[in-house]
């Protein structure tokens, strides 16, 4: 897929951990199908994350996994995140980590390897491009996914479908 060609799906994802590490945490995502008027969004509260501590980075990665869940194999997806960690881990660092047996440049084990490998596997089923957006800088859809993640972490009701649609319109993602 050429770099300037929009993917069929556009996904925004964000994660939050109220105490980092320790949680509770939350994830939020919005997915738009550009080929037809379809929208999916959601949020999940995480009190525990298996044997791992709930951290902001784990919630950021989980939010992307939730956004990619259920998308048809082979489709192109543009994922937008305000986490440099997510964008760099999945588009840059992962190649070196694989070559080094899942070790960092410092020789340490890669943190969150389980989620990164899950995203890598899902990314191989899809055609995923990652891009970064500055967080808390007024991007309407990023603000909505942040609110979804924060609300989920607190166990509160998050933005409504009307709020999500309003943000998508404000960002000129939909008409």
From Swiss-Prot:
Q: Which residues form the RNase H type-1 domain?
A: 5-154
**Which residues does the annotation say bind Mg(2+) 2?**
14, 146
Q: Which cofactor does it need?
A: Mg(2+)
Q: What is this protein called?
A: Ribonuclease H
Q: Which organism is it from?
A: Anaeromyxobacter sp. (strain Fw109-5)
Residues given in the record as Mg(2+) 1 binding sites: 14, 60, 82
Q: What is its main location?
A: cytoplasm
Gene from which the chain derives: rnhA
- Quick one: a GO cellular component term? cytoplasm
């Amino acid at each position: 897929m050429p770099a300037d060609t929009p993917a069929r799906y556009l996904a925004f994802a964000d994660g939050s951990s109220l105490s980092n590490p320790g949680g509770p945490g939350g994830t939020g995502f919005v997915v738009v199908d550009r080929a037809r008027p379809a929208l999916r969004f959601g949020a999940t509260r995480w009190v525990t994350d298996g044997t791992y501590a709930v951290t902001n980075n784990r919630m950021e990665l989980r939010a992307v996994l939730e956004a990619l869940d259920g998308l048809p194999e082979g489709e192109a997806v543009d994922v937008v995140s305000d986490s440099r960690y997510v964008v760099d881990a999945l588009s840059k660092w992962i190649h070196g980590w694989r070559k080094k047996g899942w070790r960092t440049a410092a020789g340490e084990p890669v943190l969150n390897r389980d989620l990164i490998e899950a995203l890598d596997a899902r990314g191989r089923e899809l055609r995923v491009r990652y891009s970064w957006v500055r967080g808390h800088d007024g991007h309407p859809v990023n603000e909505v996914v942040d609110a979804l993640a924060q609300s989920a972490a607190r166990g509160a009701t998050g933005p409504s479908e009307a709020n999500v649609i309003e943000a998508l319109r404000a960002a000129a993602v939909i008409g």
